Amino acid sequence: MEKFNDIYQRAVSRKGSEEMLHALLSNPLDDTDIAKMHDDLWLEEFTRKVFQSGFYWSVINNKWAGFRDVFWDFSVEKLLMMPPDMLEQKASDERIVRNFKKVQTIPENAYMIHEVAEKHGSFSQFIADWPTDNIIGLWAYLKKHGARLGGNTGPYALR
């Protein structure tokens, strides 16, 4: 296995300096900031990553305003009250990528977020309270309880 230091040095070399490399890295939020996030943001990010999987990301990004309009800014509460026939109508809206299987994940993941929030106060609090030394356990949870959040989709959404 290649040593981390070798990988790091190669990255520094490619970017020109440690400062330039570090400028490209994001700073993770602390638990307090994560806990303050609105649960609708999680649903939006899960949905974005589900749709980006298997598509050109630029296509999804270009249509994202349409997704937000069609799905009420990913309001968990509104999506939980949506009747099934309305979901079919929304899945055929030209403002979004019309992939019914992926559209079905939106209310399914809204339900998962709602269920977790009922037990933990909010989905954000659940994420903030998750032990940082068991991130793989969180990925497994999302895979098991979420819709299409296995593989890299769940981990990418948590970034």
Task: Describe the role of every protein-language-model region.
Residues 72-145:
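Alpha-helical ds-nucleic-acid-binding substructure associated with the helix-hairpin-helix region
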Residues 1-96:
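N-terminal polyanion-binding entry modules of DNA glycosylases/AP lyases
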Residues 154-159:
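Short hydrophobic alpha-helical segments that form membrane-spanning helices or hydrophobic packing faces
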